[in-house]
Amino acid sequence: MSLFRDDGIVLRTQKLGEADRIITLLTRGHGRVRAVARGVRRTKSKFGARLEPFSHVDVQFFSKGSELVGRGLPLCTQSETIAPYGGGIVTDYARYTAGTAMLETAERFTDHEGEPAVQQYLLLVGALRTLARGEHAPTLVLDAFLLRSLAVNGYAPTFGDCAKCGMPGPNRFFSVGSGGSVCVDCRVPGSVVPSPQALELLGALLTGDWGTADAAEPRYVREGSGLVSAYLHWHLERGLRSLRYVEK
Protein backbone atom coordinates (compact mmCIF):
# COMPACT_ATOMS: atom_id res chain seq x y z
CA MET A 1 0.00 0.00 0.00
CA SER A 2 1.36 3.41 -0.99
CA LEU A 3 0.48 7.09 -1.01
CA PHE A 4 1.23 9.28 -4.02
CA ARG A 5 0.87 13.02 -4.52
CA ASP A 6 0.76 14.82 -7.85
CA ASP A 7 -0.58 17.87 -9.66
CA GLY A 8 -3.18 17.27 -12.34
CA ILE A 9 -5.92 18.58 -14.60
CA VAL A 10 -9.30 16.88 -14.30
CA LEU A 11 -10.18 15.61 -17.79
CA ARG A 12 -13.54 13.99 -17.08
CA THR A 13 -15.62 12.23 -14.45
CA GLN A 14 -18.10 9.37 -14.49
CA LYS A 15 -20.60 8.11 -11.94
CA LEU A 16 -19.79 5.10 -9.81
CA GLY A 17 -22.46 3.69 -7.52
CA GLU A 18 -24.71 6.09 -5.63
CA ALA A 19 -22.19 8.61 -4.29
CA ASP A 20 -18.80 8.01 -5.92
CA ARG A 21 -17.09 9.03 -9.14
CA ILE A 22 -14.22 7.83 -11.26
CA ILE A 23 -11.99 10.83 -11.93
CA THR A 24 -9.69 10.89 -14.96
CA LEU A 25 -6.76 13.28 -14.63
CA LEU A 26 -3.68 14.21 -16.62
CA THR A 27 -0.96 14.52 -14.01
CA ARG A 28 2.51 16.00 -14.10
CA GLY A 29 4.40 12.97 -12.84
CA HIS A 30 2.24 9.96 -13.70
CA GLY A 31 0.55 10.89 -16.99
CA ARG A 32 -3.09 9.89 -17.29
CA VAL A 33 -4.55 8.46 -14.10
CA ARG A 34 -8.02 7.17 -13.24
CA ALA A 35 -8.96 7.14 -9.57
CA VAL A 36 -12.05 6.62 -7.43
CA ALA A 37 -13.25 9.60 -5.39
CA ARG A 38 -15.66 8.41 -2.73
CA GLY A 39 -18.68 10.40 -1.63
CA VAL A 40 -18.09 13.27 -4.05
CA ARG A 41 -21.62 13.20 -5.48
CA ARG A 42 -23.16 14.12 -2.17
CA THR A 43 -24.67 17.62 -2.24
CA LYS A 44 -22.45 19.04 0.51
CA SER A 45 -19.18 17.53 -0.69
CA LYS A 46 -16.53 20.27 -1.01
CA PHE A 47 -14.13 17.54 -2.07
CA GLY A 48 -16.26 16.82 -5.12
CA ALA A 49 -16.48 20.48 -6.12
CA ARG A 50 -12.69 20.53 -6.49
CA LEU A 51 -12.72 17.54 -8.84
CA GLU A 52 -14.68 18.93 -11.76
CA PRO A 53 -13.38 19.05 -15.37
CA PHE A 54 -10.92 21.90 -16.09
CA SER A 55 -9.79 22.06 -12.45
CA HIS A 56 -6.05 22.22 -11.76
CA VAL A 57 -5.55 20.34 -8.51
CA ASP A 58 -2.99 18.94 -6.10
CA VAL A 59 -4.16 15.39 -5.43
CA GLN A 60 -3.23 12.61 -3.02
CA PHE A 61 -3.80 9.02 -4.13
CA PHE A 62 -3.88 5.78 -2.15
CA SER A 63 -2.85 2.66 -4.07
CA LYS A 64 -2.99 -0.96 -2.94
CA GLY A 65 0.30 -1.70 -4.71
CA SER A 66 3.75 -0.13 -4.86
CA GLU A 67 2.85 1.70 -8.10
CA LEU A 68 0.10 4.24 -8.62
CA VAL A 69 -1.27 2.48 -11.72
CA GLY A 70 -1.57 -1.25 -12.24
CA ARG A 71 -3.41 -2.95 -9.37
CA GLY A 72 -6.98 -1.76 -9.52
CA LEU A 73 -8.04 1.87 -9.44
CA PRO A 74 -6.35 3.97 -6.75
CA LEU A 75 -8.38 6.11 -4.37
CA CYS A 76 -8.30 9.88 -4.54
CA THR A 77 -8.11 10.74 -0.83
CA GLN A 78 -7.30 14.47 -0.80
CA SER A 79 -7.53 17.34 -3.26
CA GLU A 80 -6.53 21.00 -3.08
CA THR A 81 -7.28 23.52 -5.81
CA ILE A 82 -4.29 25.06 -7.57
CA ALA A 83 -6.35 27.00 -10.12
CA PRO A 84 -10.12 26.76 -10.76
CA TYR A 85 -9.95 27.26 -14.54
CA GLY A 86 -13.48 26.00 -14.93
CA GLY A 87 -14.88 29.23 -13.48
CA GLY A 88 -13.61 31.21 -16.46
CA ILE A 89 -14.56 28.55 -19.01
CA VAL A 90 -17.92 26.93 -18.31
CA THR A 91 -19.92 30.19 -18.31
CA ASP A 92 -18.97 30.99 -21.92
CA TYR A 93 -20.08 28.62 -24.69
CA ALA A 94 -17.14 29.30 -27.02
CA ARG A 95 -14.61 28.80 -24.24
CA TYR A 96 -16.41 25.74 -22.93
CA THR A 97 -16.52 23.93 -26.27
CA ALA A 98 -12.89 24.81 -27.01
CA GLY A 99 -11.85 23.66 -23.55
CA THR A 100 -13.77 20.40 -23.88
CA ALA A 101 -11.94 19.68 -27.13
CA MET A 102 -8.62 20.33 -25.35
CA LEU A 103 -9.46 17.86 -22.59
CA GLU A 104 -10.47 15.19 -25.11
CA THR A 105 -7.30 15.78 -27.13
CA ALA A 106 -5.10 15.46 -24.05
CA GLU A 107 -6.77 12.19 -23.12
CA ARG A 108 -6.43 10.78 -26.64
CA PHE A 109 -2.71 11.58 -26.75
CA THR A 110 -2.10 9.91 -23.37
CA ASP A 111 -3.75 6.56 -23.95
CA HIS A 112 -1.38 4.58 -21.70
CA GLU A 113 -2.14 5.12 -18.04
CA GLY A 114 0.75 5.81 -15.70
CA GLU A 115 3.19 6.94 -18.40
CA PRO A 116 4.51 10.48 -17.77
CA ALA A 117 3.57 13.01 -20.45
CA VAL A 118 5.03 16.20 -19.00
CA GLN A 119 5.00 18.23 -22.22
CA GLN A 120 1.35 17.38 -22.88
CA TYR A 121 0.49 18.24 -19.28
CA LEU A 122 2.25 21.62 -19.43
CA LEU A 123 0.60 22.41 -22.77
CA LEU A 124 -2.82 21.70 -21.31
CA VAL A 125 -2.23 23.78 -18.17
CA GLY A 126 -1.03 26.74 -20.25
CA ALA A 127 -3.87 26.49 -22.76
CA LEU A 128 -6.58 26.29 -20.09
CA ARG A 129 -5.05 29.24 -18.23
CA THR A 130 -5.05 31.33 -21.41
CA LEU A 131 -8.58 30.24 -22.29
CA ALA A 132 -9.96 31.01 -18.83
CA ARG A 133 -8.42 34.49 -18.83
CA GLY A 134 -9.87 35.33 -22.25
CA GLU A 135 -6.51 36.51 -23.57
CA HIS A 136 -7.20 35.37 -27.15
CA ALA A 137 -10.15 34.10 -29.19
CA PRO A 138 -11.11 30.58 -28.05
CA THR A 139 -10.74 29.15 -31.55
CA LEU A 140 -7.18 30.44 -31.78
CA VAL A 141 -6.26 29.07 -28.36
CA LEU A 142 -7.71 25.69 -29.31
CA ASP A 143 -5.94 25.49 -32.66
CA ALA A 144 -2.63 26.51 -31.05
CA PHE A 145 -3.09 23.76 -28.47
CA LEU A 146 -3.97 21.16 -31.10
CA LEU A 147 -0.96 22.03 -33.27
CA ARG A 148 1.45 21.97 -30.34
CA SER A 149 -0.03 18.72 -29.05
CA LEU A 150 0.58 17.19 -32.46
CA ALA A 151 4.14 18.53 -32.38
CA VAL A 152 5.08 17.15 -28.94
CA ASN A 153 3.69 13.77 -29.98
CA GLY A 154 5.85 13.64 -33.10
CA TYR A 155 3.35 14.86 -35.71
CA ALA A 156 4.41 18.48 -36.21
CA PRO A 157 3.04 19.81 -39.53
CA THR A 158 5.08 22.04 -41.82
CA PHE A 159 3.64 25.27 -43.16
CA GLY A 160 6.49 26.43 -45.39
CA ASP A 161 9.16 24.03 -46.58
CA CYS A 162 8.05 20.85 -48.33
CA ALA A 163 7.31 18.11 -45.80
CA LYS A 164 8.59 15.41 -48.18
CA CYS A 165 11.66 16.75 -49.97
CA GLY A 166 12.48 19.84 -47.93
CA MET A 167 12.17 22.33 -50.79
CA PRO A 168 12.21 25.80 -49.20
CA GLY A 169 8.81 27.44 -48.91
CA PRO A 170 6.43 28.88 -49.32
CA ASN A 171 4.93 25.89 -51.11
CA ARG A 172 1.51 26.01 -52.66
CA PHE A 173 -0.01 22.66 -51.73
CA PHE A 174 -0.97 21.06 -48.40
CA SER A 175 -1.42 17.35 -47.68
CA VAL A 176 -2.43 16.03 -44.26
CA GLY A 177 -1.08 12.58 -45.10
CA SER A 178 2.28 13.95 -46.22
CA GLY A 179 2.86 16.09 -43.14
CA GLY A 180 1.79 19.56 -44.25
CA SER A 181 2.99 21.83 -47.03
CA VAL A 182 4.29 20.08 -50.15
CA CYS A 183 5.86 21.30 -53.36
CA VAL A 184 4.38 20.79 -56.80
CA ASP A 185 6.56 17.72 -57.43
CA CYS A 186 5.61 16.03 -54.13
CA ARG A 187 1.90 16.76 -54.13
CA VAL A 188 -0.38 13.75 -53.94
CA PRO A 189 -4.04 13.23 -54.84
CA GLY A 190 -6.18 14.95 -52.25
CA SER A 191 -3.76 17.82 -51.70
CA VAL A 192 -5.44 21.18 -51.20
CA VAL A 193 -4.34 24.72 -51.99
CA PRO A 194 -4.79 26.85 -48.86
CA SER A 195 -4.47 30.59 -48.85
CA PRO A 196 -1.02 31.91 -47.85
CA GLN A 197 -2.74 33.83 -45.04
CA ALA A 198 -4.16 30.65 -43.50
CA LEU A 199 -0.76 28.95 -43.58
CA GLU A 200 0.87 32.03 -42.05
CA LEU A 201 -1.72 31.95 -39.26
CA LEU A 202 -1.12 28.28 -38.51
CA GLY A 203 2.63 28.81 -38.45
CA ALA A 204 2.11 31.66 -35.99
CA LEU A 205 -0.08 29.51 -33.73
CA LEU A 206 2.47 26.72 -33.73
CA THR A 207 5.33 29.04 -32.77
CA GLY A 208 3.43 31.33 -30.39
CA ASP A 209 3.38 34.47 -32.54
CA TRP A 210 0.16 35.84 -31.04
CA GLY A 211 0.52 39.25 -32.67
CA THR A 212 0.13 37.67 -36.10
CA ALA A 213 -2.55 35.23 -34.93
CA ASP A 214 -4.74 37.86 -33.27
CA ALA A 215 -4.61 40.04 -36.39
CA ALA A 216 -5.86 37.28 -38.73
CA GLU A 217 -9.14 37.86 -40.53
CA PRO A 218 -12.04 35.57 -39.53
CA ARG A 219 -12.15 33.85 -42.94
CA TYR A 220 -8.51 32.76 -42.55
CA VAL A 221 -9.15 31.63 -38.99
CA ARG A 222 -11.98 29.40 -40.27
CA GLU A 223 -9.84 28.08 -43.10
CA GLY A 224 -6.96 27.36 -40.75
CA SER A 225 -9.23 25.57 -38.29
CA GLY A 226 -10.43 23.29 -41.08
CA LEU A 227 -6.84 22.32 -41.90
CA VAL A 228 -6.03 21.67 -38.23
CA SER A 229 -9.14 19.51 -37.85
CA ALA A 230 -8.30 17.46 -40.94
CA TYR A 231 -4.68 17.03 -39.86
CA LEU A 232 -5.66 15.97 -36.35
CA HIS A 233 -8.28 13.54 -37.67
CA TRP A 234 -5.67 11.91 -39.90
CA HIS A 235 -3.21 11.29 -37.08
CA LEU A 236 -5.74 10.26 -34.44
CA GLU A 237 -7.46 7.98 -36.98
CA ARG A 238 -10.83 9.16 -35.77
CA GLY A 239 -12.00 12.68 -35.06
CA LEU A 240 -12.74 14.33 -31.76
CA ARG A 241 -16.41 14.21 -30.84
CA SER A 242 -16.15 17.57 -29.10
CA LEU A 243 -14.82 19.41 -32.17
CA ARG A 244 -18.22 19.38 -33.86
CA TYR A 245 -19.53 21.75 -31.19
CA VAL A 246 -16.72 24.29 -31.42
CA GLU A 247 -17.78 27.66 -32.80
CA LYS A 248 -15.72 28.61 -35.83
Swiss-Prot record:
SUPFAM superfamilies: ArfGap/RecO-like zinc finger, Nucleic acid-binding proteins. Transmembrane segments: none annotated. Gene3D superfamilies: Nucleic acid-binding proteins, Recombination protein O, C-terminal domain. This is DNA repair protein RecO. GO terms for cellular component: bacterial nucleoid. It comes from Streptomyces coelicolor (strain ATCC BAA-471 / A3(2) / M145). InterPro entries: ARFGAP/RecO, DNA_rep/recomb_RecO_N, NA-bd_OB-fold, RecO, RecO_C. The keyword DNA repair applies. Pfam families: RecO_C, RecO_N. The gene is recO. Belongs to the RecO family. Keywords: DNA damage, DNA recombination, DNA repair. It comes from the Bacteria. GO terms for biological process: DNA recombination; double-strand break repair. Involved in DNA repair and RecF pathway recombination. The keyword Ribonucleoprotein does not apply.
